[in-house]
Amino acid sequence: GAEIRPSSKFFFMPNCVTNKLSIRGTDNQIEQILSAIAEKEKTDAISRSPIDFNNIIPMPADLNVESGSRGHQGLEYIIGLSKSESREEVCKTWDSLTQEEKDNRLLFGAKYFTNTMRYGFPTWYEWRTQNWGTKWNACNASKSGNIIFFGTAWSTPEPIIKALSVKY
């Protein structure tokens, strides 16, 4: 069968990891894997990334929502889970907000709640770090024959590599 062989090297920047993914097998197996993991959304092959984590472990589209304090504050209000404040105290901090800002917090909070109930995570951020091992998709990717070089934030995307190894 085909063999997936990862290696990682840290960039000079502490946040970035350079990954080298070597794919071994027959020419047909290699082409099948490269085709399966390549970005599909862009139509021209030149700008298309040779690796898209969504083609390996797809993230539910509903999770593609802003990750930030607005949503977490709205969620705390909705379910009353603020660790340090009661619902009333949370609302007091909202006194300086416009009605539109309050509504946005509640909308984000409701979305976070729905996502957590459905997927176990409120946003893309929590889901990706758990399921991909990194917060962003592959970046600055290039391909040379059966080798793909790509960057990731913070760490090697071990769940992605494992999923590829299991599948192929």
What residues fall within each predicted segment?
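Long, contiguous binding/interaction regions
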Residues: K9-Y168
